[in-house]
Amino acid sequence: MKRQLILEDGTVLIGTGFGGEIEKSGEVVFTTGMTGYQETLSDPSYCGQIVTFTYPLIGNYGINRDDFESIHPSVNGLIVNEICDHPSNFRNEISLNDYLKERNIPGLAGIDTRKLTRKIRQYGTLRGRLCNMDADVEYIVSQLKATVFTDHVKRVSTKDPYPSPGRGHRVVLVDFGMKHGILRELNKRDCDVIVVPYNTTAEEILRLSPDGIMLSNGPGDPKDVPEAIEMLKDIIGKVPLFGICLGHQLFALASGANTSKLKFGHRGLNHPVKNIATGKVAITSQNHGYAVEEESVENTELEITHVALNDGTVEGLRHKKFPAFTVQYHPEASAGPEDANDLFEDFLTMIENFKKEGEELCQNA
């Protein structure tokens, strides 16, 4: 079955269709990860996007029940050079092709993914549509140019609060499109976690008596989530806070800094990040299309703690007065290296120190 990818600039790439037979539009992006395709297609941060894999062969170890990062996949489509029809792995339960058919997610194989990746790198992220061969190219292009993708966080966030009990520190995890890996890392440390929707107010969060607040990853432009920014303005300084990815960007906006769209984003499993204080370099998993503007941090109470070695963009922030820090990358990995996993320990240490300071103030009062 032939299928085509039509881009907003009029480019048409023809290949072989796989997966669902539906037509889908989305922001066409690329990821450089050689593995981790199951985590990618189930990562809510990819909501509304058509993901191109730069590695030439995808699907060779199939799909299993353990490696999902959310219950429902959020991608609008997959593009690969070659899809493996006969996966081989002891954990394999279903092929990638069959899984995408079940979930009605379209895929495109047999195109020059290097050519497509170079185009995105040169011209920036493009809107595109995976469609049948009889599609009207001119009409599709006009529709793509007029399309604005919004409300991604609303689509992927939990609708209702729910607990993930533990015996340790109580952590309220604000779900902007949370990867399960973040929750797993908190559970490993026996945290008593309450997951809440993206639009939960500061008053509602504080009513839960949290020891700490975790801001999750999520899709899209952080400025599309004004209710979260307002919530953070009322939260910062009252409870220890740790933010990841979109949570990092929202924290920056709430603190007076600014964010902007990257030309083609950071998506992959091997992005080097430098800790400014120690000089240590961590290889990190990343998935974001926006970043905090470095110059906008200067007139705030924030300090930059980490930078990307590939392009110098801001990768970490810390508040100068209050117990709060954030990173742009994914310390929970899933998939990817675990170089930055100790940030979860730093978060718990910050909570303990904040508690001790509060106890000392009470004793001295």
Curated annotation (Swiss-Prot):
InterPro entries in the record: Anth_synth/Amidotransfase, CarbamoylP_synth_ssu, CarbamoylP_synth_ssu_N, CarbP_synth_ssu_N_sf, Class_I_gatase-like, CPSase_GATase1, GATASE
Keyword Ligase on entry: yes
The Glutamine amidotransferase type-1 domain, residue ranges: 170-357
Pathway(s) where this gene product acts: Amino-acid biosynthesis; L-arginine biosynthesis; carbamoyl phosphate from bicarbonate: step 1/1; Pyrimidine metabolism; UMP biosynthesis via de novo pathway; (S)-dihydroorotate from bicarbonate: step 1/3
Enzyme class name: ligase
Subunit structure: Composed of two chains; the small (or glutamine) chain promotes the hydrolysis of glutamine to ammonia, which is used by the large (or ammonia) chain to synthesize carbamoyl phosphate. Tetramer of heterodimers (alpha,beta)4.
Name of protein: Carbamoyl phosphate synthase small chain
Organism per entry: Bacillus anthracis
